[in-house]
Amino acid sequence: MPHPLATQQQVAAALATLSGWRSDHGELRVSYRFPTFDAAVAFTLTIAAAAAAADHHPEWTVRYRVVDVATTTHDSGGITALDLDLARTIHALAAKARGEAVAG
């Protein structure tokens, strides 16, 4: 059964605490720049571990030192609590890995 979609207020409240994150056509998106390519790739491995633990899997792209991340709940057709929680986790992981949110 699909998870209920988050309300606009829930999304706005979460985004207020997630620097660099934005809502875009039913997805939460962010781009992080890292000191090196190796640091960017290592960050994706931490995302993979967190996603596996949450059983919720975002998409990401590595562009040299920049990692673009997007999360949505496909079964529900938009942003759910799963995405808000995963965004919070990814945000904390990026801070720990010295990722800097940048315009995507």
Regions found by a protein language model. Name each.
Residues 1-104:
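Long, contiguous binding/interaction regions
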